[in-house]
Amino acid sequence: MVKTQRVVITPGEPAGIGPDLVVQLAQREWPVELVVCADATLLTDRAAMLGLPLTLRPYSPNSPAQPQTAGTLTLLPVALRESVTAGQLAIENGHYVVETLARACDGCLNGEFAALITGPVHKGVINDAGIPFTGHTEFFEERSQAKKVVMMLATEELRVALATTHLPLRDIADAITPALLHEVIAILHHDLRTKFGIAEPRILVCGLNPHAGEGGHMGTEEIDTIIPVLNELRAQGMKLNGPLPADTLFQPKYLDNADAVLAMYHDQGLPVLKYQGFGRGVNITLGLPFIRTSVDHGTALELAGRGEADVGSFITALNLAIKMIVNTQ
């Protein structure tokens, strides 16, 4: 890394394990400066509950970034709306969570930060606060005015991107259009090259229907939509294999010769990845004008403040963001 970079972290739901994990991240040295967008008292109180040392130093955007020393975090303050009890949701803090996401996103857009790493949010309490919220991916897409973003989850061994994200099953077939697939595959291919340093990405593409449609006998989306798009993109030089049946794609004879899998919908691709590497996975938003990674788990309210939360996914998300920063320099 040519110079020290700043990355911004949002801990997520304040009553969940996000603050715990951020405090745990602070217990080691990092080659980047960790700027945490959060309430100061929330972090110091949670550190005290965990019995871990934590010193907060003020964010100074006009000073050169410094590698993070163990036991410290750089604080970009956002005030809670209500006091926090670990494990107990407070509706008004839904506004606080969205404020942290907005500030962190804006900081990436204006060049303050080289990457954004997000902790788990509670979508229900944000919506209960009167804020329509589908997820991080959609929030950052809208706020950054990105033309299109793609959700991808990754472990050390497997990357799975999604053609559609948080849609009811009944709506998925209609959503799989030639225009959508062109956009999604183009973004996936581009970001694998630019952010992951893969010169010629090899992508496996799932079919939509059982047995990838069985030649049109179990649905025609493969024949009508997926195959024509793949043929067009292959003619442009992309290395695409598919459409393949999702129930047989996830095995070494295919995965050993691929850099990523494109699944047609959320529950087609992610159960395999999460079974294979739950707690070690990272959620990545492709297509944004900045690097964004996230943990692959939820808020785990029942573990907040108990010292039992596993920081593994957060460490992996941060390490991957650092690698992506290096690849884009």
Swiss-Prot record:
Primary residence: cytoplasm
HAMAP family cross-referenced by the UniProt entry: PdxA
Quaternary structure annotation from Swiss-Prot or TrEMBL: Homodimer.
Keywords from the UniProt entry: Cobalt, Cytoplasm, Magnesium, Metal-binding, NAD, NADP, Oxidoreductase, Pyridoxine biosynthesis, Zinc
Protein residues bound to a divalent metal cation: 166, 211, 266
A Pfam family hit: PdxA
Binding site for substrate: 136-137, 274, 283, 292
One GO BP: pyridoxal phosphate biosynthetic process
More about this protein: The active site is located at the dimer interface.
Pathway(s) served: Cofactor biosynthesis; pyridoxine 5'-phosphate biosynthesis; pyridoxine 5'-phosphate from D-erythrose 4-phosphate: step 4/5
Cofactor mode of binding and number, as noted: Binds 1 divalent metal cation per subunit. Can use ions such as Zn(2+), Mg(2+) or Co(2+).
PANTHER family, alphabetized: 4-HYDROXYTHREONINE-4-PHOSPHATE DEHYDROGENASE (PTHR30004:SF5)
Cellular localisation: Cytoplasm
Protein name in UniProt: 4-hydroxythreonine-4-phosphate dehydrogenase
Catalytic activity entry: 4-(phosphooxy)-L-threonine + NAD(+) = 3-amino-2-oxopropyl phosphate + CO2 + NADH
Annotated organism of origin: Shigella sonnei (strain Ss046)
